[in-house]
């Protein structure tokens, strides 16, 4: 194909891997991205567009003849970029970050450029072995027990996201339970989480055939900091056992989405061991912080855990996508997900990652994460997280010092949850006015915050996490919030 002449014009040879073009056009793209980042701070964080804005600007049929990279990038700049929510903006504080870095971006380029598919060891040996190395490196950075490392009998895999990681562990736990009680008992399988657990667990449970009524969300309480209570979990398990059901899985979290709650891993682990349940820990957000020694106490009891996942693309500068999943005993996962086709067999004692994930094809994510760790070192990754936490502490202190506001939940990482004070707003209107405050801030284009409705309370979430955010951006955000509140609260 690369050297096949055009039937209409033999002198025109189509070569999709023209290396001269690659060198020239990649520079155009890198320059475009650089300019985008240079202007990012001045752009409205959220786009001011309406549904269908892009459809009307693009042709309804694909171009028959190719176009130049210059023309394509011009359309990206004029038609695509104005409709983006700028997740890398230093003023983006709505959701947990999709962290970006030079090394992550260039590692992504290497991943795409090498374009290997390491579904078995033999299909690309270096891809598999580098992934083995990287997941062990990260396990040691988190100070996980050696039993989670390949060198200690466990192991890990890089998934695309937490949804896929959780789904894999659910499938493994389901099959492990059914091997014990029989396949005909699948409708009796029950899993447990808290009402603060990410909806990923509900989605994954449905995909593996768990009935909705058997997904038990245990109510959390403010006086217990909204943690999943081990005693409540134990009571729920006992009740279900008495009803003839089969408890098989529990999910704890390090850094929930709404509040940043950290569940008591050690105590949950004891309950899981008592009743032979699979315990998974979702560390999608807060897990990354545990490379810092001051946060590693949140992992106390992790030796009682069957699996743990963490999104490096949230806080460890890897760019999307990169999710670590570790298991103490990978065999249950492999037995559940193994592909048996003869042509897929690796024929070696090495890991075949096709048996550690849902899909067969897989990206060379390890080279990107390896590049990030090597380029910055553990010390700079720790400093990056500490810097974000420090700015979050600064923001929290400014909010707490203004009597028009109140902190909803004690900050654990770099998420600050706050609202207008009920004492400074008309009776019963604090949530309504807090929502109005958030909407006005967001509509200004100068910042982007998110909100949560929890019971009758509405509060604002402010996450510090963009790689470009500096103290001045946090100070500017606080001034914007104060000025906006002035027109809402007298």
From Swiss-Prot:
Q: Where is the signal peptide?
A: none
At what positions is N6-(pyridoxal phosphate)lysine found? 314
Coiled-coil ranges (or none): none
Q: Does the keyword Protease apply?
A: no
List of residues binding L-phenylalanine:
97, 198, 313, 343
What PANTHER family would the database entry show? GROUP II PYRIDOXAL-5-PHOSPHATE DECARBOXYLASE, TYROSINE DECARBOXYLASE 1-LIKE
Which proteins does it associate with, and in what oligomeric form? Homodimer.
UniProt family annotation: Belongs to the group II decarboxylase family.
Q: What is this protein called?
A: 4-hydroxyphenylacetaldehyde synthase
């Amino acid at each position: 194909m690369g050297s096949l002449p055009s039937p209409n014009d033999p002198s025109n040879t189509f070569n999709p891997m023209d290396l001269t073009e690659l060198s020239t056009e990649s520079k155009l793209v890198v320059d475009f991205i650089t300019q985008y980042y240079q202007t990012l701070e001045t752009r409205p964080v959220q786009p001011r567009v309406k549904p269908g804005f892009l459809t009307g600007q693009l042709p309804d049929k694909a171009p028959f003849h190719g176009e130049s990279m210059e023309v394509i990038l011009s359309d990206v700049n004029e038609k695509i970029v104005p409709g983006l929510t700028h997740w890398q903006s230093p003023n983006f504080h709505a959701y947990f970050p999709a962290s970006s870095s030079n090394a992550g971006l260039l590692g992504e380029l290497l991943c795409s450029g090498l374009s290997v598919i390491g579904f078995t060891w033999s299909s690309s040996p270096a891809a598999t072995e580098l992934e083995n190395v990287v997941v062990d490196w990260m396990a040691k950075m988190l100070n996980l027990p050696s039993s989670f490392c390949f060198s200690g009998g466990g192991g890990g895999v890089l998934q695309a996201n937490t949804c896929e990681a959780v789904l894999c562990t659910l499938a493994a736990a389901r099959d492990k339970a059914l091997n014990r009680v029989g396949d005909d008992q699948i409708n009796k399988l029950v899993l447990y989480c808290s009402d603060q657990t990410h909806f990923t667990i509900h989605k994954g449970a449905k995909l593996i055939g768990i009935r909705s009524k058997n997904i038990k969300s245990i109510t959390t309480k403010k006086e217990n900091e909204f943690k999943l209570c081990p005693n409540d979990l134990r009571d729920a398990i006992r009740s279900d056992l008495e009803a003839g059901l089969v408890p098989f899985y529990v999910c704890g979290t390090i850094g929930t989405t709404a509040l940043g709650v950290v569940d008591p891993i050690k105590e949950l682990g004891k309950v899981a061991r008592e009743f032979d349940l699979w315990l998974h820990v979702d560390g999608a957000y807060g897990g990354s912080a545990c490379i810092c020694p001051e946060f590693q106490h949140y992992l106390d009891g992790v030796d009682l855990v069957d699996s743990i996942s963490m999104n490096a693309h949230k806080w460890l500068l890897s760019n999307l996508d990169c999710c670590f999943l570790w298991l103490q005993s990978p065999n249950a996962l492999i037995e559940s997900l193994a592909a048996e086709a003869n042509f897929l067999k690796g024929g070696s004692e090495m890991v075949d990652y096709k048996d550690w994930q849902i899909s067969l094809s897989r990206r060379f994510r390890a080279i990107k994460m390896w590049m990030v760790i090597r380029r910055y070192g553990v010390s700079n990754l720790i400093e990056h997280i500490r810097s974000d936490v420090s700015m979050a502490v600064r923001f929290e202190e400014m909010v707490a010092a203004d009597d028009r506001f109140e902190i909803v939940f004690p900050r654990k990482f770099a998420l600050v949850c706050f609202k207008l004070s009920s004492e400074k707003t008309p009776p019963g209107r604090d949530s309504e006015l807090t929502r109005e405050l958030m909407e006005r801030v967001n509509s200004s284009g100068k910042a982007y915050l998110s909100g949560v409705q929890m019971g009758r309370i509405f509060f604002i979430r402010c996450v510090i996490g963009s790689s470009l955010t500096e103290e001045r951006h946090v100070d500017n955000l606080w001034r914007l919030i104060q000025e906006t509140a002035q027109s809402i609260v007298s």
